[in-house]
From Swiss-Prot:
This is Cecropin-B. Its main location: secreted. PROSITE patterns: CECROPIN (PS00268). GO terms for biological process: antibacterial humoral response; defense response to Gram-negative bacterium; defense response to Gram-positive bacterium; defense response to insect; defense response to virus; innate immune response; response to Gram-negative bacterium. One of its GO terms (cellular component) is extracellular space. Residues 1-22 form the signal peptide. The gene is CecB. Belongs to the cecropin family. Cecropins have lytic and antibacterial activity against several Gram-positive and Gram-negative bacteria. It comes from the Eukaryota.
């Protein structure tokens, strides 16, 4: 019976430790995905600006 209490205690400590480790790993992955999304958004905004300028130049050249 004493062994069961020790086993449950050790299992609980391991579960808490591994749970915190997983949360950190998952948070890092989320931050990387968020950063990729931000870079994609910024790049698309720049491309739209360049395309709009090119359209303005083409319209000006046509007259």
């Amino acid at each position: 019976m004493n062994f069961n209490k020790i086993f449950v205690f050790v299992a609980l400590i391991l579960a808490i430790s591994l749970g915190n480790t997983e949360a950190g790993w998952l948070r890092k992955l989320g931050k990387k995905i968020e950063r990729i999304g931000q870079h994609t958004r910024d790049a698309s905004i720049q491309v739209l600006g360049i395309a709009q300028q090119a359209a303005n130049v083409a319209a000006t050249a046509r007259g």
